[in-house]
Design a protein with these regions (language model features):
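ABC ATPase C-loop
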Residues: 141-142
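Q-loop/switch helix immediately C-terminal to the Walker
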Residues: 76-90
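The feature captures the beta-strand-to-loop junction immediately N-terminal to the Walker
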Residues: 17-19
Length: 245
């Protein structure tokens, strides 16, 4: 990353685009604590977390990865995964399993996914489809209303119908809880459709930032022209990396 200066207001939903090697994943890993910056600092809700290890930083952060197999424990049941996510920010883990009220809360939460998972609490997560696991991962990441939600190409590995389902669910959950969110995507149309801010990265830098009303007027064609104007080169060479569907 090179001279990154990014400030998010509470409730901002920022979509991030850029071809492979632009620095998108590095940005996410810096925020989450997987990587540490050589210079500069990272603050979450005015708290300096720059040297805070990833496992401690996770109390502030929810993250969903591209791989549906990540983010859940496949050998555990849906209920056990939800209990684990629910207790993430608690001072002590659940000791006596899940009580009746907690189970009912889990069921009501799962109903919002519209996948009938509320009737499969005892099913092993490893038996779920990719779309079901990604929906569960998204729910788990937002359970405790994190200070910031990181979505790292979380629909890229799904078929089109499941990707649309997860996209719609993302919008619903983020809007419902007004979650401050950063979403990396290769799908330019998705980047335009979601969020109130958009940033474009290239070679480790933020080369374009668009906010609010200006973002609503953007089209894929305008984005590509803006890149060419800034960098003096075309994005067409990246058409296999940046989906326009």
């Amino acid at each position: 990353l090179d001279q990154i200066n990014l400030t998010l207001e509470k409730g901002d939903f920022v979509t991030v685009i850029g071809s492979n090697g632009a620095g998108k994943s590095t940005l996410m890993n810096m925020i989450s604590g997987v990587l540490s910056p050589d210079v500069g600092k990272i603050q979450i809700e005015n708290k300096d977390v720059t040297r805070l290890p990833e496992f401690k930083r996770s109390k502030f952060i929810g993250r969903v990865f591209q791989d549906p197999m990540a983010g859940t424990a496949p050998s555990m049941t849906i209920e056990e995964n939800l209990a684990m996510a629910f207790s993430r920010n608690k001072s002590r883990a659940l000791r006596k399993g899940v009580d009746k009220n907690r189970k009912e809360f889990f069921k009501e939460s799962l109903k919002t996914l519209h996948l009938n998972l509320e009737n499969r609490l005892n099913a092993k997560v490893g038996l779920l489809s990719g779309g079901e696991r990604q929906a569960l991962s998204l729910l788990m990441a937002t359970f405790t209303q994190p200070s910031i939600l990181l979505l790292d190409e979380h629909t890229a590995a799904l078929d089109p119908s499941r990707a649309r389902l997860i996209t719609d669910l993302t919008k619903e959950l983020v809007e419902k809880d007004q979650l401050t969110t950063i979403m990396v995507t290769h799908n330019m149309q998705q980047a335009l459709d979601l969020g109130n801010r958009l940033i474009m990265m290239d070679k480790g830098q933020i080369i374009l930032e668009v906010k609010e009303e200006e973002k609503k007027k953007l089209t894929i064609d305008l984005l590509m022209k803006e890149f060419q104007k800034i960098r003096g080169e075309t994005m067409l060479s990246d058409k296999t990396l940046l989906s326009i569907d």
